[in-house]
Amino acid sequence: HMRNHSGTKPFQCTQCSYSCVNKSMLNSHLKSHSNIYSTLCQDCSYATKY
């Protein structure tokens, strides 16, 4: 919690300049670099990575 107040962002993406305060946020961000879609609509072409 204190990282939010101190501005420390120790978790950094190896593919871009993104950094964040916790590993969970980094894991969510890493999905943006993949071509894997976790949600696909069966009725249209809508897809999301999250």
Curated annotation (Swiss-Prot):
One of its GO terms (cellular component) is nucleus. Keywords: Developmental protein, DNA-binding, Gap protein, Metal-binding, Nucleus, Repeat, Zinc, Zinc-finger. It comes from the Eukaryota. One of its GO terms (biological process) is segmentation. It is found in: Nucleus. One of its GO terms (molecular function) is zinc ion binding. Signal peptide: none annotated. Its main location: nucleus. A zinc finger (C2H2-type) spans 1-5, 11-33, 39-50. Coiled coil: none annotated. InterPro entries: Znf_C2H2_sf, Znf_C2H2_type. Gap class segmentation protein that controls development of head structures. Belongs to the hunchback C2H2-type zinc-finger protein family. This is Protein hunchback. It comes from Psychoda cinerea. The lineage of its organism: Eukaryota, Metazoa, Ecdysozoa, Arthropoda, Hexapoda.
